[in-house]
Amino acid sequence: MPSAHSVKLRPLEREDLRYVHQLDNNASVMRYWFEEPYEAFVELSDLYDKHIHDQSERRFVVECDGEKAGLVELVEINHVHRRAEFQIIISPEYQGKGLATRAAKLAMDYGFTVLNLYKLYLIVDKENEKAIHIYRKLGFSVEGELMHEFFINGQYRNAIRMCIFQHQYLAEHKTPGQTLLKPTAQ
């Protein structure tokens, strides 16, 4: 697993859009994302411009030893209800090395301690066993199953909604006197 010092999050910048575009257009990366792979770069640029000051989302680039290794996003941030949707993509060459767990913890620390969110939730394909295993390891629990939620490759797919609450996360990952890891983008 990458060391604590080799993994960090930083805010998504315009210069990162080519990297994001490569991830978005990789069918193996996007197969569990319930979205069509393949979007035009101009569409991605327009989305970036439209949402650059949107307070309902925080998007981070995951870096491992200074190299771009994935994306972590807190989207649909609702400050009244103190919740957000958690999303993560790790580049194929960095998968299986514990990076998703490290990056997720950094984003969760940010969500629960900086944004003071009460709840993080996610939607995952029921058949994505690797992701579900990682999410359970991080403390997420199943809230329910969404039947025939997404139409992908000619068939409907079920999804699982999972969540974790601030008090659960802090009890598991913060001890008295310990400083939580923070993304560099505070």
Curated annotation (Swiss-Prot):
Pathway(s) it belongs to: Amine and polyamine degradation; spermidine degradation; Amine and polyamine degradation; spermine degradation
Annotated control of activity: Heat shock, alkaline shift, ethanol treatment and poor nutrient availability produce increased concentrations of monoacetylated spermidine. Inhibited by alkaline phosphatase, N(1),N(8)-bis(ethyl)spermidine (BESPD) and N(1),N(12)-bis(ethyl)spermidine (BESPM).
The keyword Cytoplasm is assigned to this record: yes
Catalysed transformations (reactions): an alkane-alpha,omega-diamine + acetyl-CoA = an N-acetylalkane-alpha,omega-diamine + CoA + H(+); spermidine + acetyl-CoA = N(1)-acetylspermidine + CoA + H(+); spermidine + acetyl-CoA = N(8)-acetylspermidine + CoA + H(+); spermine + acetyl-CoA = N(1)-acetylspermine + CoA + H(+)
GO biological process: coenzyme A metabolic process; polyamine catabolic process; spermidine catabolic process; spermine catabolic process
A single MF term (Gene Ontology): magnesium ion binding
Domain N-acetyltransferase: 7-167
Residues given in the record as spermidine binding sites: E35, E43
Subcellular location: Cytoplasm
Pfam families reported for this sequence: Acetyltransf_3 (PF13302)
InterPro entries cross-referenced by the UniProt entry: Acyl_CoA_acyltransferase, GNAT_dom
Gene Ontology CC annotation, any one: protein-containing complex
Summary of the knockout phenotype: Cells lacking this gene accumulate spermidine at late stationary phase and show a reduced cell viability due to a decrease in protein biosynthesis. At 37 degrees Celsius, growth of mutant is normal in the presence of 0.5 or 1 mM spermidine. However, following a shift to 7 degrees Celsius, the addition of 0.5 or 1 mM spermidine results in inhibition of cellular growth or cell lysis, respectively.
Temperature dependence: The level of spermidine acetyltransferase activity increases at low temperature to prevent spermidine toxicity.
Domain of life the protein comes from: Bacteria
NCBIfam families documented for this protein: PRK15130.1 (NF011709)
Further details from the record: Acetylation neutralizes the charge of the polyamine, which is then typically excreted from the cell.
UniProt-listed PANTHER family: SPERMIDINE N(1)-ACETYLTRANSFERASE
Protein name (Swiss-Prot/TrEMBL): Spermidine N(1)-acetyltransferase
